[in-house]
A protein has these predicted regions:
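Short, positively charged low-complexity motifs
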Residues: 6-8
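Intrinsic disorder/low-complexity segments, especially N-terminal tails and targeting/processing regions
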Residues: 10-12, 18
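Terminal targeting signals and extreme-terminal segments of soluble enzymes
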Residues: 17-158
Length: 158
């Protein structure tokens, strides 16, 4: 698990003009601590890429599995994909807005074992308040699952 803050390894935008709502925090404050639900997935890294995608790496343990510790349960896989897409939207909105997932579709292509995983998200279309995103999950360079989601952007309460 990440030990230093901020937990998202990002080139932070300049603080002027990027303040978050009422408590006057900038985007670096938003990503300062790992949210509790991400600790369950054992998040290990998060960062934007040069080609306008966002990567989140996880290393789920056996506590998230069924089948005698061999397969990560599909709901947790879905959660990791959703997390990657959501964190990308938060990053792109500089923390001023957060996404609410309206729907998510996941295709499971291979079993997901405990251990290192890499999720990659991109934004396929972004409107004023509705965004369409996609994410893929890889393990050992093999495609495990794909997802697409519709998200409604709302003002950040933070």
């Amino acid at each position: 698990m990440l030990s230093s803050a901020p937990w998202v390894r990002i080139p932070l935008p300049p603080p002027i003009g990027n303040r978050m709502s009422d408590n006057n925090k900038d985007i670096s404050e938003f990503f300062r601590e790992v949210p509790p639900f991400l600790k369950v997935f054992n998040i290990t890294n998060a960062y934007p890429t040069d080609d306008d995608q966002f990567v989140v790496e996880f290393s789920p343990g056996e506590e998230l599995t069924h089948s005698n510790g061999m397969v990560v349960q599909g709901g947790f896989v879905t959660g990791m994909l959703d997390c990657c897409m959501a964190q990308f939207l938060i990053y792109k909105a500089k923390g001023k807005q957060i996404p609410l997932t309206l729907d998510i579709d996941v295709k499971f292509l291979r079993p997901c074992a405990p251990g290192p995983l890499k999720t990659v998200a991109n934004i396929t279309k972004q409107g004023k308040s509705i965004c369409f995103t996609e994410a893929t999950l890889y393990q050992n360079d093999k495609l495990i699952a794909t997802s697409s989601a519709t998200n409604k952007m709302v003002e950040s309460p933070f």
